[in-house]
């Protein structure tokens, strides 16, 4: 009995002296070591991977997709220059608008004058043959030649619808026409294309060779007339007889005519 007790004590002492031989304790130690190793390995791997991928991905991606653009700010002087240029362009545009309106107005006036000329041309064309025939029959001309001069006596008989500039041209009849025997300023149409004064109704000095258009107002000034003088003392007022005195009295403009009523 005593020997058995001593043997048991020896076994207990051996177990205490060598704890690693305990299977339960050794198993627990192995599990703790494996847990430490796996924690350190996973922490380092995830930290390095996430750091490298997130750093490289964000750096490279942002650099390639969003390049920096340099913006040069405008100075005050440059802004003032742009503003002045814009004002000049606006002023030029206003001038062009005014010029366009002026051209439209002039074209409207020219169209009206052309229509009036067309009407007058139709009337003259219709009556020209009648007038010529009447003139041949009614005019009793007596010519007295003295050297190079020729005297034409007025007709003594009246021919209906014959062209006249005064009652003397109708014999015993009357020359009907409110403006007959006066200078016709309407023959000069302002702005009408011309190469010479004949296109401006014969008004001497009316054709502007620079613009190639009729400038009737300037022609009045050339003959020492203001617009007031022209409209009150010259146009449809100055006397003429449809002959050579048109050049002197009417400055080349034609003479208004009427028709004889017998």
Swiss-Prot record:
Compositionally biased intervals (Low complexity): 39-53
Domain of life: Eukaryota
Signal peptide: 1-17
Annotated keywords: Glycoprotein, Proteoglycan, Signal
InterPro entries per the UniProt record, alphabetical: Cpg-3
Residues the record marks as carrying a glycan: 140, 148, 224
Region (Disordered): 37-68
Name of this chain's protein: Chondroitin proteoglycan 3
Gene that specifies this protein: cpg-3
